Amino acid sequence: MVRKMQMFADGRSRKVVFLAHCLLNQNAISDGTAEVPAAHREILRTVLDARVGVVQLPCPELCCLGLDRGDPKGGERPVVAENTRIRRAMGQPEASARLRELTDQVVWQIREYQKHGFAVLGIVGVDRSPCCGVNTTSDQDRELPGRGVFIASLRAALESAGLTVPVIGIKPSAPEALDRVRPLLGE
């Protein structure tokens, strides 16, 4: 009789959380909006201290529009005005097609983790973002209730694939940000 070895029975926790790209890399964020030099340390530390692996979501704005978001003067505008411009640019055919590809890649990763018995604890987006907002987004030159275009696409794709994953939005520098992340981690 041959015994089959269980895969991934090593030191890993078999738990992951998907974090918005800019939480781990502020260098990717739109001009004029970075709050810290590199990454939001407290969020990352909280996740790692809970022994949860981190999967960095792609930055849809960077991947679809480039680092300057298609306008080198974007940082001169008020944040919500620039975010509204970015949101509109994400609706253009080329950006929309690329956004669907990014969404499909994330859904594939989630399915792959779940297929192998990993717990996908959740997805953490960034509120006010035109792409990664969960509770609020930017449109009409202001912050409004609603989802960013990437999170909306991702939630629809997850539902279509029959995958259930909690999705929360935070404002990383807000005092309550860690309190919103901790329940995902089982704390």
Residue positions per predicted region:
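Short coil/turn segments at beta-strand junctions that form active-site/ligand-binding loops
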Residues: 13-15, 52, 118-121
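Short, surface-exposed acidic-centric catalytic microdomains
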Residues: 37-89
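Divalent-metal-activated hydrolytic enzyme cores
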Residues: 3-7, 11-13, 38, 80-115, ...
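Residues lining hydrophobic/aromatic ligand-binding pockets adjacent to catalytic sites
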Residues: 2-16, 25-40, 44, 58, ...
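Active-site-proximal loop/turn and secondary-structure-junction residues that shape catalytic pockets
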Residues: 23, 60-63, 129-131, 171-174
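Internal, conserved structured core segments that host functional sites
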Residues: 119-138
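A structural signal for short, well-ordered beta-strand segments and their strand-loop junctions
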Residues: 18, 54-58, 122-126, 166-171
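Short catalytic/ligand-binding loop motif for oxyanion handling, primarily in non-cytosolic enzymes
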Residues: 27, 64-66, 131-135, 176-178
